[in-house]
């Protein structure tokens, strides 16, 4: 460190270089403190700490001869400098970094004393924090042991605190802010003073380590000569201990003791209020160049990743640049672990390390176990990525750019999985299951070609192989069956776990993937055999959302396969609910006051199921089911009570009540007008309206879907026509029906025969004439139906009154408690 001083004499009796360091380090703090307190009883300490330490009589005489402009004059601390002298001389005092820190410590100590006089604990708390930060910088710059001004301040503060604790009446009289500050200072002082127990004990006994260290080297240092007004003095070899050893790029190297002390400090301050997390990250980043051993690097990287993740909050995700740094640090940690996989293992079940600085003791096989969890780190990184997508506008390019980072995350998950497989016990598969369930979450909803591409990128940057999910070949990555095999392998491991959450999530994801690939019967059988319908109501909200998504995807799969009835049954419960978005994890309730936890349950946008497509499929399925059913029960008095889809019936009734119906504008209008056309038997108009819906382009094979819908509309149009107009015919030719609905005669005959067999249509088939002969039954008018219903109700009422008059015949079968209850009610 450079020292500037000015001298007006060539005398050799000037202060030595050690005197300069000593007076600069202690004078600005101790002298001002002693002067504030009215002096110190210990004359030796006063002489050592004072700026104006008395030298020999000869030295003082020389200084007097030079008019008080010797070297010691220009080393006055800024806190005690005489402004009049500075104005007279016009000289500027240049302070070193150490002098400035000591001056700052002295200033904080003075303000703390002022706060003690007026009992202002808010001021004391603020200045105490500043004091500790200055002391932290003092330690980092390796200026030596804690100075006396700092030790004296914390000792006196603790004594004053103990005195205040005895005055309980005064504590009760404090206001809220002062009381909170008092409790905070009490906790911090006790915790802080434990770190300086040795220095405090030495101070209490009357000594000072910092002064003794300087006194040892004081005699060996030559006194500098002042040749000019300002002279740069080169430090001697004896003062090398006060300089910091630096590495590459001039960065200071930290000793192992200081390194693990910093790690301990960061660990203890995590999760506390008023903690500067960014400063903690900077501290850990500064430790990386000093980490020379593998154990030190692992310790620093593990703490650095966790601390970076703490930069996020509950209501905001981690910034993209910080998230990328976390992924980079985690990959660096994995690289170190993979390179030293035969000597170091980071596992959760590792025993606690007795000597943190020396590291863990090696086992018989030479492996050293470090307590930690790589799986937990990558889980938090995955959660931060999901949170970022949740709180981001999905309709911007930023969302797409952020989504590209998923491949980096997936590759990191794969590396962690391979590491856990190597270091963990074969019987302990919990850590492996935690990673596999994350991989399943990233893959189960994606098409096969996207899964193949993701696997190709992930395995391209990873060496080695995996037992649970072997490395795919080039042929596998171009196959459409590899994604199904991959998900089956991962789910098979999850099925063996004792944790029901893992098993349930694996089952639902497996069913979802089968349904997405149009394997309806496999998905349906697996879904029914799981018996999740009976227990899902008590599951976690996230599992309930996944259950609803799987059920909806099963219905979409049935619709694509042409199974209209199965599709309608699967979609009925979810699509009829007004909380559709909330049930699928794609939004919140309309008028609900959602908190942060509720918002985090919403899935990222790229995993959503298109709600417009879902509504279109459900309404089309209800159309093909409800219109023939309405036509079959049109003459029944209880026709309105027999409903397949209440939602569809309500929409249709609303559409019929409209005075004027314009051209269809949306999906719902197309389907409602198609329903009215189908009721008339005009299947062609219904087909044109349904096929005109643009949402079909989102399905994999839209033309095949439209062809399937055309066939279904022809069949259901034929059934609706027969249900509506059969009583107007005595016989009806099958060829005529075939021409009307453009169906083969064989198909028409099969449909009519099935309706007759199920007693839906009164009549019979005449094979000679190739026609259907209807049986004309007696048809009741609307008035007759109402009269019959009224007579039935009157008869029931009369019978009940007769039993009541007879003495309560209907109560004979009741139990005795029920009879007493009925009698009390009377």
Swiss-Prot record:
A GO-annotated cellular component: cytoplasmic stress granule
Keyword Protein biosynthesis in record: yes
SUPFAM superfamilies: Winged helix' DNA-binding domain
BP GO terms, sorted: formation of cytoplasmic translation initiation complex; translational initiation
One Gene Ontology MF term: translation initiation factor binding
Keywords assigned: Cytoplasm, Initiation factor, Protein biosynthesis
InterPro entries, A to Z: EIF3C, EIF3C_N_dom, PCI_dom, WH-like_DNA-bd_sf, WH_DNA-bd_sf
Annotated segments matching region Disordered: 1-71, 205-227
Subunit architecture: Component of the eukaryotic translation initiation factor 3 (eIF-3) complex.
Name the record gives this protein: Eukaryotic translation initiation factor 3 subunit C
Organism: Yarrowia lipolytica (strain CLIB 122 / E 150) (Yeast)
Gene name tied to this protein: NIP1
């Amino acid at each position: 460190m450079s020292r500037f001083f000015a001298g007006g004499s060539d005398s050799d009796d000037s202060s030595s270089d050690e005197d300069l360091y000593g007076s600069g380090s202690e004078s600005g703090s101790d002298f001002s403190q002693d002067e504030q307190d009215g002096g110190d009883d210990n004359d030796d300490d006063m002489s050592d700490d004072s700026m104006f330490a008395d030298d020999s009589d000869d030295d003082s005489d020389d200084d007097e001869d030079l008019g008080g402009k010797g070297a010691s004059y220009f080393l006055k601390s800024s806190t005690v400098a005489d402004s009049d002298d500075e104005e007279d001389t016009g000289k500027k005092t240049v302070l070193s970094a150490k002098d400035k820190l000591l001056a700052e410590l002295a200033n904080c100590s003075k303000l703390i004393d002022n706060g003690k006089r007026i009992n202002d604990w808010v001021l004391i708390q603020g200045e105490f924090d500043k004091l500790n930060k200055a002391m932290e910088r003092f330690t980092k710059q390796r200026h030596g042991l804690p100075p006396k001004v700092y030790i004296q301040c914390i000792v006196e503060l603790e004594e004053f605190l103990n005195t205040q604790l005895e005055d309980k009446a005064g504590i009760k009289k404090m206001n809220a802010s002062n009381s909170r500050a008092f409790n905070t200072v009490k906790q911090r002082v006790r915790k802080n003073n434990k770190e300086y127990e040795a220095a405090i004990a030495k101070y209490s006994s009357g000594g000072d380590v910092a002064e003794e260290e300087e006194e040892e080297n004081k005699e060996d240092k030559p006194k500098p000569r002042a040749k000019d007004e300002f002279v740069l003095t080169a430090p001697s070899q004896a003062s090398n201990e006060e300089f910091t050893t630096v590495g590459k790029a001039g960065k200071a190297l930290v000793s192992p003791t200081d390194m693990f002390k910093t790690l301990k400090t960061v660990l203890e301050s995590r999760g506390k209020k008023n903690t500067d997390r960014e400063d903690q990250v900077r501290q850990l980043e500064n430790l990386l160049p000093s980490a020379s051993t593998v154990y030190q690097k692992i310790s620093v990287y593990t703490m650095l990743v966790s601390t970076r993740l703490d930069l996020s909050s509950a209501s905001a995700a981690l910034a993209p640049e910080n998230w990328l740094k976390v992924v980079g640090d985690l990959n660096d940690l994995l690289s170190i672990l993979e390179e030293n996989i035969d000597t170091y293992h980071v596992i959760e079940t590792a025993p606690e390390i007795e000597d943190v600085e020396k590291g863990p003791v090696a086992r018989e096989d030479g492996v050293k176990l470090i307590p930690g969890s790589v799986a937990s780190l990558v889980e938090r990184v995955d959660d931060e990525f999901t949170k970022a997508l949740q709180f981001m506008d999905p309709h911007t390019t930023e969302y797409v750019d952020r989504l590209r980072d998923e491949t980096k995350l997936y590759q990191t998950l794969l590396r962690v999985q391979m590491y856990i497989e190597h270091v963990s016990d074969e019987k302990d598969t919990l850590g492996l299951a935690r990673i596999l369930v994350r991989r399943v979450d990233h893959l189960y909803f994606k098409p096969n070609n996207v899964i193949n591409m993701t696997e190709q990128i992930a395995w391209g940057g990873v060496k080695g192989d995996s037992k649970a999910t072997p490395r795919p070949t080039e042929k596998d990555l171009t196959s459409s069956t590899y994604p199904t095999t991959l998900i089956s392998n991962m789910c098979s491991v999850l099925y063996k776990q004792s944790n029901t959450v893992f098993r349930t999530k694996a089952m639902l994801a497996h069913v979802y993937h089968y349904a997405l690939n149009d394997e309806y019967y496999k998905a349906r059988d697996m879904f029914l055999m799981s018996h999740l319908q009976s227990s899902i109501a008590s599951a976690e909200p996230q599992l309930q959302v996944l259950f609803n998504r799987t059920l909806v995807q099963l219905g979409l799969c049935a619709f694509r396969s042409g199974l209209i009835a199965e599709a309608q049954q699967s979609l009925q419960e979810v699509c009829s609910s007004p909380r559709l978005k909330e049930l699928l994890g794609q939004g919140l309730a309309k008028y609900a006051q959602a908190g942060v936890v509720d918002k985090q349950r919403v899935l990222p946008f790229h995993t959503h199921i298109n709600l417009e497509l879902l509504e279109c499929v459900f309404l089309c399925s209800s159309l093909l089911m409800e219109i023939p059913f309405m036509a079959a029960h049109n003459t029944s008095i209880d026709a309105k009570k027999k409903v397949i889809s209440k939602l569809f019936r309500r929409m249709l009734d609303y559409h019929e009540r409209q005075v004027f119906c314009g051209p269809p504008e949306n999906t719902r209008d197309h389907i409602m007008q198609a329903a009215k056309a189908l009721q008339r038997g005009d299947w062609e108009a219904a087909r044109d309206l349904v096929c005109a819906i643009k949402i079909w382009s989102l399905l994999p094979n839209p033309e095949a879907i439209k062809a399937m819908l055309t066939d279904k509309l022809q069949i259901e149009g034929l059934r609706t026509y027969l249900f509506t107009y059969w009583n107007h015919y005595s016989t009806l030719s099958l060829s005529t029906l075939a021409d009307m609905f453009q169906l083969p005669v064989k198909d028409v005959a099969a449909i009519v025969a099935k309706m007759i067999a199920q007693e839906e249509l009164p009549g019979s088939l005449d094979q000679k004439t190739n026609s259907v002969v209807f049986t004309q039954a007696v048809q009741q008018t609307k008035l007759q139906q109402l009269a019959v219903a009224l007579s039935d109700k009157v008869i029931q009422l009369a019978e009940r009154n007769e039993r009541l008059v007879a003495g309560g015949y209907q109560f004979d079968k009741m139990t005795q408690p029920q009879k007493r209850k009925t009698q009390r009610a009377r």
